[in-house]
Amino acid sequence: MARTVVLITGCSSGIGLHLAVRLASDPSQSFKVYATLRDLKTQGRLWEAARALACPPGSLETLQLDVRDSKSVAAARERVTEGRVDVLVCNAGLGLLGPLEALGEDAVASVLDVNVVGTVRVLQAFLPDMKRRGSGRVLVTGSVGGLMGLPFNDVYCASKFALEGLCESLAVLLLPFGVHLSLIECGPVHTAFMEKVLGSPEEVLDRTDIHTFHRFYQYLAHSKQVFREAAQNPEEVAEVFLTALRAPKPTLRYFTTERFLPLLRMRLDDPSGSNYVTAMHREVFGDVPAKAEAGAEAGGGAGPGAEDEAGPSAVGDPELGDPPAAPQ
């Protein structure tokens, strides 16, 4: 019996790496996995994980694929020796964290290019053949940060909101083609996903006001707490992908955690958005009287409270991993 051919983007670490070796090592031996990476020099960890799980020979191959380059995507497609991809996993992504006014234009453009346009490039390369064959599955790494706004994740959330619209629109179209598309909505995950583009606290302060600077440190402290309490291992998240892949009638969305569903329901129940905005503000920052808000703006210098909240290494701290409820 022919094996199911799976191609996954973004396999140098995290969810992509763990999903690739999970499928390649599946006891059924029913998957042929193409794990793609932007830079093949980073494939060492992938093969270490494959050896640890005793992936059978021929179950896993690596391909160079840079979602920012349509020629690279097309070249990877041509190297799939079976001539087809049964399951496409769009997983490559970038994160971006910080006050909006402190983010560089190039960093903003890079996140949108990888997370949104990069996903479009991959879909454009592989969807037509699935439609012609009348079968196929597409799994896209989403985020609850694509379903609700998170402070200091403005651009990242914008990119994930865009994926929601892209995928939901395609899912409606693809029904009669026999192609199923599902979003895997992740919360915080223990990965090296987040790219810290901010410099020292002083550099951040130079690019924003003192009040926003204090708020950022409050957010970092909250983020670390949520990460400690709720972050999932990528192996656990990979099982949700497998559930979607094997479902007889896959749904549009699969959630890797239920922790954030109450906030999502609140957002849906109140189309005006006011209840969600108030609830999320309290969740992250607590109740701060208006007088204190004004005082923070008028105060001079960051003061000791800024570092006391989250510690002096909060900016760029690898322990932060993904932003709360916004992993991939």
From Swiss-Prot:
Keywords: Cytoplasm, Lipid biosynthesis, Lipid metabolism, NADP, Oxidoreductase, Steroid biosynthesis. The keyword Chaperone does not apply. NADP(+) binds at residues 10-38, 66, 160. One of its GO terms (cellular component) is cytosol. It catalyses: 17beta-estradiol + NAD(+) = estrone + NADH + H(+); 17beta-estradiol + NADP(+) = estrone + NADPH + H(+). Its EC number is 1.1.1.62. Pfam families: adh_short. Belongs to the short-chain dehydrogenases/reductases (SDR) family. This is Estradiol 17-beta-dehydrogenase 1. It comes from Pan troglodytes (Chimpanzee). The lineage of its organism: Eukaryota, Metazoa, Chordata, Craniata, Vertebrata. The gene is HSD17B1.
